[in-house]
């Protein structure tokens, strides 16, 4: 990397970091952190543990924003100093170090930009992602299992705790439905753009004639509400069914009815949880999912988008697709909203979907 190229990069990074400073309002940010720390120092702080944890989480998030900004600013100053020294006297080792620092700074800035883009009210929350194959039988159900693998790999690679809440086996292969919980800060913010219909084009391994098939699978994403948001659900409005349940692939089938299915009669929303060992645990998880769906339903009504959040999307077909995954006759994954695309389809199916997530966040600003 030439020094002139490094200089141009650092000038661009400097503009971005100055923009971060303006958007963050550092003085106000420092005041907010100080106020929260003062609250945490009070003797009665832990009297309400749920409220205390919320304050701690907010404080940690603000500190992370502040510390990350300061770290980027320090890196920029060090890089600028090294550049000045190299312009006066060449030093091969120092130039290699500067190139590495410039690359690392660019990566930090990109990550920080994403953090700033996660500015919706529920972006910081955990997420529940549901996969529902459309019509197409085994081929569509196998596509659902491929998406499940893609998302779980993405979550694990990014340090999220990934938990299967409910899993229903496909008739021959794949799955009929799955609900996956992602635990970690900003899980919903990163995943909310994955909601929609995902289209697969490939030569089906289940077709003896080796014909090309097109399959559709619906992905739904909702925030997992915390205790700060109350959703009232009347007992009279909920029908509960219990059934025997087992893990993915038919493992550990229970001899008692631990699986729980909840139906919200007024809206027709159905949720279920099967992966906990107890009926009580599955009921709690199913109720949390139901509350999230009801809350999101109300939010979508205000935005005139209620049809997208009634448990199952109305039609899993061409019209509502957000992304196409083409294996044959060529290899390409393309997002129909942002235009972002890649030919590295194997990497995408292994969970490398950051490019699509980042492109959506920028597109949706």
Curated annotation (Swiss-Prot):
Its main location: cytoplasm. It is found in: Cytoplasm. One of its GO terms (cellular component) is cytoplasm. It comes from the Bacteria. The keyword Cytoplasm applies. PROSITE patterns: RF_PROK_I. The keyword Protein biosynthesis applies. The modification N5-methylglutamine is found at residue 251. Methylated by PrmC. Methylation increases the termination efficiency of RF2. GO terms for molecular function: translation release factor activity, codon specific. Peptide chain release factor 2 directs the termination of translation in response to the peptide chain termination codons UGA and UAA. This is Peptide chain release factor 2. It comes from Lactococcus lactis subsp. cremoris (strain MG1363).
């Amino acid at each position: 990397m030439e020094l002139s190229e490094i200089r141009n990069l650092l000038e661009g990074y400097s503009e971005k970091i100055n923009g971060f400073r303006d958007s963050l309002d550092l003085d106000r940010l420092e005041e907010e952190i100080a106020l929260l720390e003062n609250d945490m120092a009070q003797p009665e702080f832990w009297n309400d543990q749920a409220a205390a944890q919320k304050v701690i989480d907010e404080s940690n998030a603000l500190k992370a924003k502040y510390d990350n900004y300061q770290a980027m600013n320090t890196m920029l100053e060090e890089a600028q100093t090294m550049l000045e020294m190299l312009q006066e006297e060449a030093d091969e080792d120092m130039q290699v170090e500067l190139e590495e620092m410039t690359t690392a700074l660019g990566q930090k800035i990109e990550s920080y930009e994403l953090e700033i883009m996660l500015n919706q009210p529920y972006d910081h929350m955990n997420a529940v992602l549901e996969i529902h194959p459309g019509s197409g039988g085994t081929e569509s159900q196998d596509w659902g299992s491929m998406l499940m693998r893609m998302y779980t790999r993405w979550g694990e690679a990014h340090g999220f705790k990934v938990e299967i809440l409910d899993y229903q086996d496909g008739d021959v292969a794949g799955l009929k439905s799955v609900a996956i919980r992602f635990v970690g800060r900003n899980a919903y913010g990163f995943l909310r753009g994955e909601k929609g219909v995902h289209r697969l084009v490939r030569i089906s391994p289940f077709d003896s004639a080796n014909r090309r098939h097109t399959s559709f699978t619906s992905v739904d994403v909702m925030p997992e509400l915390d205790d700060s948001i109350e959703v009232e659900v009347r007992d009279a409005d909920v029908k509960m069914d219990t059934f025997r349940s087992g893990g993915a692939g038919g493992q550990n089938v229970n001899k008692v009815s631990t699986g729980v299915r909840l139906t919200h009669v007024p809206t027709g929303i159905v949720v279920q949880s099967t992966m906990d060992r107890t009926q009580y645990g599955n009921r709690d998880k199913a109720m949390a999912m139901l509350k999230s769906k009801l809350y999101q339903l109300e939010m979508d009504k205000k935005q005139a988008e209620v049809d997208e959040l009634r448990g199952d999307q109305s039609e899993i077909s061409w019209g509502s697709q957000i992304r196409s995954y083409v294996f044959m006759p060529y290899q390409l994954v393309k997002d129909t909203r942002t235009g972002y695309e890649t030919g590295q389809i194997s990497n995408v199916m292994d969970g490398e979907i950051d490019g699509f997530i980042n492109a959506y966040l920028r597109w949706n600003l």
